[in-house]
Amino acid sequence: MTLAVAVAPLEKTPLETYVPPAKPSLIGLSRAELAERLGAIGVAPAQRKMRAQQLWHWMYVRGARDFAEMTNVSKEMRATLAEHCTVDRPEVVAEQISADGTRKWLLRLPSGDDVQKAHEVECVYIPETDRGTLCVSSQVGCTLNCSFCHTGTQRLVRNLTAGEIVGQVMVARDRLGDWIDRETPNGNRLVTNVVMMGMGEPLYNFEAVRDALLIVTDNEGIGISRRRVTLSTSGVVPNIARTGDEIGVMLAISLHAVRDELRDELVPLNRKYPLKELLQACRDYPGASNARRITFEYVMLKGVNDSLDDARRLVQLLKGIPAKINLIPFNPWPGSKYECSDWDQIEKFSEYVFNAGYSSPVRTPRGRDILAACGQLKSETEKLSVRERDALRAMAMTD
């Protein structure tokens, strides 16, 4: 059965302009940009490369939050830096910890604009026995209007800067005590994986996401392996190849349907980049192999996309693509038109896909009680009513 869901037309929404603070943060700058910034505040050309490398180490290896911590930088240089720049990251407005250990942070983004217009995003840390995954946002809000996703009900406000994206990783390390110091010379390794699966469509903010992930994966900095970084897209086809060529991280596709007519409803971007184009881009993805499989995310919606015929079509669609399929039980939110598939049906679907030769794990919902599960993120810029929050928590507790 296909639900007829009204979807808004895909239109370009006017974005608010990012206003940098009076003293901009150095977080998010490349080494070359750091050297250029140092030149702008009077550092001699012969010293810029060395000073930039010092700053890089203190920011991304040691997690320094103030220039005063940078003990191998001269006092005069530290004073000059403090006069013109900061190493600020987003401000933690609220932290929630789920019964399952998942943590969600509401982050206010530094801005030179009126504080009343400050924007907020959410990022989520999911601890597991063998890894710790940080779910990072790329935009304030989202423009895609995916009908099953809570974030899609919030208008797109603006793109995040590279610094605001890297800053989310740094905030997580701050809060978890995950930086290198004398007590933990190798770090605690609590944040081992990063997924660009938070608020927004990463490939509609490609340059900032690229620049941020190159910092996150830099071996002389934050140092998370590219194989442990996954970028999820709803299918912005022109930037998929660029992701492989320019960033080189793992790719995930928010698929959710095997027929164009249904995907047009669930993921309206499909009307611009239909399944045939999307899957060809996946076949052509640089570096894809059995060792670097593309993940296809598939939310399980009762009576909508969960039949065995859907499973058969899914297997046929992915033929020739090194892939695995993540089956995601639908996470409820107030006002949603959908229900989660019955567990028995999810297992049948998974078994069929597995027997066809594809890994098909069912993602365990995490953080539902703090609105941190897949598809539930929505910044406080557009607050839920008390009634909506109570309804959502009730769903989480009874699920």
From Swiss-Prot:
UniProt keyword annotations, A-Z: 4Fe-4S, Cytoplasm, Disulfide bond, Iron, Iron-sulfur, Metal-binding, Methyltransferase, rRNA processing, S-adenosyl-L-methionine, Transferase, tRNA processing
Cofactor needs: [4Fe-4S] cluster
E.C. no: 2.1.1.192
Active site residues of this protein: E122, C374
InterPro entries per record: Aldolase_TIM (IPR013785), Elp3/MiaA/NifB-like_rSAM (IPR006638), Methyltransferase_A (IPR040072), RlmN_N (IPR048641), RNA_MTrfase_RlmN (IPR027492), rRNA_lsu_MTrfase_RlmN/Cfr (IPR004383), rSAM (IPR007197)
The protein's name: Dual-specificity RNA methyltransferase RlmN
Binding site for S-adenosyl-L-methionine: G200, E201, S232, S254, L255, H256, N331
Principal EC category: transferase
Subcellular location: Cytoplasm
Single Gene Ontology MF annotation: tRNA binding
GO terms for cellular component: cytoplasm
Disulfide bond sites: C135-C374
Annotated residues for binding of [4Fe-4S] cluster: C142, C146, C149
Entry function: Specifically methylates position 2 of adenine 2503 in 23S rRNA and position 2 of adenine 37 in tRNAs. m2A2503 modification seems to play a crucial role in the proofreading step occurring at the peptidyl transferase center and thus would serve to optimize ribosomal fidelity.
One example of a Gene Ontology biological process annotation: tRNA methylation
Note: Reaction proceeds by a ping-pong mechanism involving intermediate methylation of a conserved cysteine residue.
Every Radical SAM core domain range: 128-371
Cofactor binding summary note: Binds 1 [4Fe-4S] cluster. The cluster is coordinated with 3 cysteines and an exchangeable S-adenosyl-L-methionine.
Family note: Belongs to the radical SAM superfamily. RlmN family.
Pfam families cross-referenced by the UniProt entry: Radical_SAM (PF04055), RlmN_N (PF21016)
Reaction catalyzed: adenosine(2503) in 23S rRNA + 2 reduced [2Fe-2S]-[ferredoxin] + 2 S-adenosyl-L-methionine = 2-methyladenosine(2503) in 23S rRNA + 5'-deoxyadenosine + L-methionine + 2 oxidized [2Fe-2S]-[ferredoxin] + S-adenosyl-L-homocysteine; adenosine(37) in tRNA + 2 reduced [2Fe-2S]-[ferredoxin] + 2 S-adenosyl-L-methionine = 2-methyladenosine(37) in tRNA + 5'-deoxyadenosine + L-methionine + 2 oxidized [2Fe-2S]-[ferredoxin] + S-adenosyl-L-homocysteine
